[in-house]
Amino acid sequence: MANHSSAKKAARQTVKKTLVNKRRASAIKTFVKKVLHEINQGNKEEANSALVIAQSKIMQGVKKNIIKLNTASRKISKLSKKIKTMN
């Protein structure tokens, strides 16, 4: 347990920031799942619109240091590729 007041404050801040980061990461995963769901359903237009939203959320995650840039680029690339290969 922290003894100094500054260490106690840092511990409190860590708890708050962890919750916010988990919430943001969960939101990113949810939007990616929506895109994958639309791809599996075969709705190309719906998948494209969901991809635009997912790209935005993924890049916001990069900006907030939730995920790394290369990871975000890979996710967006894979989703885009799946949509392009749809009939």
From Swiss-Prot:
Q: What is this protein called?
A: Small ribosomal subunit protein bS20
Q: What is the lineage of its organism?
A: Bacteria, Pseudomonadati, Pseudomonadota, Alphaproteobacteria, Rickettsiales
* Keyword hit for Ribosomal protein: yes
> Looking at the keywords, is Ligase present?
no
Q: Which terms in the GO cellular component ontology are assigned?
A: small ribosomal subunit
Tell me the function of this protein.
Answer: Binds directly to 16S ribosomal RNA.
Q: Which domain of life is it from?
A: Bacteria
The residue stretches assigned to a coiled coil in this entry are none
Question: Quick one: which gene encodes this?
Answer: rpsT
Q: Give the species this sequence originates from.
A: Rickettsia bellii (strain OSU 85-389)
Which biological processes are named by the entry's GO terms?
translation
